[in-house]
Amino acid sequence: MFRIAICDDEEIFRKNIYEIIMKYMDENGCPCEVDEFASGKDFISLGINMAKYDIVFLDINMDEIDGLETAQEIRKVSNDIFIVFVTAFVNYAVQGYSVNAIRYILKNNENLTDLIFECIDAISKVMKHTVKKKEFKFNEGIKNVPLELLL
């Protein structure tokens, strides 16, 4: 199961990223937990509990504590968390990779959904999150169900 955090001070972008992630997970039969945070300060207030997340989608330009500072705090807790910067500012890309971000995605890109899908695919391969499925035949058609969802 993927545990994902979205940290963005703009609700419209948090919701958009959330919907894209859920679409990916639904299409790929991957169970997940997704939590949203309205600021870097809110996220790093979790302290050591930040380590429960596999992936953090992180905006860079936020009030109080920006995304780069948030990423630095994440790295103090864990080097295993995949950091994905999703931002409107291209000029921070080099700094973003200094905290070992796996991707730097521009929010206003018309291919945002495809880019996030590709990003999760890449992370999934690294994490080796292979979902075993069982095929069931119904009158309405065939449905593949992840085995971990079956009792």
Over which residues does each language-model region extend?
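CheY-like receiver
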Residues: 50-129
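Switch/coupling loops of ABC transporter nucleotide-binding domains
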Residues: 2, 32, 81
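Conserved binding/recognition cores within well-folded domains
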Residues: 117-151
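Short, well-ordered amphipathic alpha-helices
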Residues: 14-24, 43, 71, 120
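Helix N-cap/capping motif at the beta->alpha junctions
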Residues: 36-45, 67
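A generic structural motif
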Residues: 25-34
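Conserved SAM-binding loop
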Residues: 6, 36, 85-86
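Conserved acidic segment of CheY-like receiver
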Residues: 2-21, 56
